[in-house]
């Protein structure tokens, strides 16, 4: 059936209140959306950040008269409160969501493919990965930068550390590209489970070891270290991340904005001979070879 969607303009401080009011007025679901296309990059621990200008969207049954709800918000927030009423046609939302995802190529050899799509090149290095939990699927520039970097390496027989493994996409890609062993580390137990499930789906579960930080091995001397997290943890955990690689090992870091790159280059330059920075949109990848 079709739906009525009511959008109310709010701020980060009032968004939760507006959400509760929409639910109280009979909304079947509520969604928050950035009203000004301003990204939220790096929340502090325990924060659930919202944009300074946030649209709160309530989804109502088609027979709902939106006028009383609009009048209610005008009474609370004033006559000039921003709002919009839309009629949404009924769709197969699952199918529409699935249609959004297509096989993606990274570098020369590597493809990331949803399970419901045909593999474009059966002779390529194909990683089967379905969007699911909020972990990497290759669509974000930082993941793409790391996948392209891995595709350009000779990983045959190598040991790879994937720090902040998320979905396991980088470690699984490394194994498919010839690595012998991957050690994946993440602070989130759901990420560990997602990595395990995806490794099984790709037939590499016996080559990947997955750890929470407290359980990670301390004597790793990897050939390749990749960390696609955020600038804050990359800064704070620099000695630990750098310590996972042996002399001459290769490292790639992402989850970094261009403005954050110079500081991290200086920090990691203590241990690595740094390569030129690779940039995709406003994100970048730092890479280098370990000294010694």
Curated annotation (Swiss-Prot):
Its main location: cytoplasm. GO terms for molecular function: protein-lysine N-methyltransferase activity. GO terms for cellular component: cytosol. GO terms for biological process: methylation. Keywords: Cytoplasm, Methyltransferase, S-adenosyl-L-methionine, Transferase. It is found in: Cytoplasm. It comes from the Bacteria. It catalyses: L-lysyl-[protein] + 3 S-adenosyl-L-methionine = N(6),N(6),N(6)-trimethyl-L-lysyl-[protein] + 3 S-adenosyl-L-homocysteine + 3 H(+). It is an enzyme of class 2 (transferase). InterPro entries: Ribosomal_L11_MeTrfase_PrmA (IPR050078), Ribosomal_PrmA_MeTrfase (IPR004498), SAM-dependent_MTases_sf (IPR029063). Signal peptide: none annotated. S-adenosyl-L-methionine binds at residues 143, 164, 186, 228. Pfam families: PrmA. Methylates ribosomal protein L11. PANTHER family: ELECTRON TRANSFER FLAVOPROTEIN BETA SUBUNIT LYSINE METHYLTRANSFERASE. Belongs to the methyltransferase superfamily. PrmA family. This is Ribosomal protein L11 methyltransferase. It comes from Aeromonas hydrophila subsp. hydrophila (strain ATCC 7966 / DSM 30187 / BCRC 13018 / CCUG 14551 / JCM 1027 / KCTC 2358 / NCIMB 9240 / NCTC 8049). The gene is prmA.
């Amino acid at each position: 059936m079709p739906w009525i969607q009511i959008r109310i303009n709010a701020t980060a401080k009032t968004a939760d209140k507006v959400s509760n009011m929409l639910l109280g007025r009979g909304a079947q679901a509520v969604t928050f959306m950035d009203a000004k296309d301003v990204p939220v990059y790096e929340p502090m621990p325990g924060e659930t950040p919202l944009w300074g200008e946030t649209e709160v969207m309530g989804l109502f049954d088609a027979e709902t008269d939106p006028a009383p709800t609009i009048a209610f918000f005008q009474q609370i927030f004033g006559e000039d409160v921003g709002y919009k009423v839309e009629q949404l046609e009924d769709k197969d939302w699952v199918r529409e969501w699935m249609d959004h995802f297509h096989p993606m190529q990274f570098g020369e050899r590597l493809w990331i493919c949803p399970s419901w799509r045909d593999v474009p090149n059966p002779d390529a290095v194909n990683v089967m990965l379905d969007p699911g939990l909020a972990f990497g699927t290759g669509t974000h520039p930082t993941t793409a930068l790391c996948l392209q970097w891995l595709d350009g390496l000779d990983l045959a027989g190598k040991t790879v550390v994937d720090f902040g493994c998320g979905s396991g996409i980088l470690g699984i890609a490394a194994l498919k590209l010839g690595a012998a062993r991957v050690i994946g580390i993440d602070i989130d137990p759901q990420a560990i489970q997602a990595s395990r499930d995806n490794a099984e789906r790709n037939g590499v579960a016996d080559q990947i070891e997955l750890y929470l930080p407290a359980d990670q091995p301390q004597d790793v001397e990897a050939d390749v270290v990749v960390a696609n997290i955020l600038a804050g943890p990359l800064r704070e955990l620099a000695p630990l991340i750098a310590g996972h690689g042996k002399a001459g090992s290769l490292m790639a870091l992402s989850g970094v904005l261009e403005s954050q790159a110079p500081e991290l280059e200086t920090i990691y330059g203590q241990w690595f001979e740094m390569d030129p920075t690779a940039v995709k949109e406003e994100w970048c990848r730092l890479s280098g070879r370990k000294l010694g």
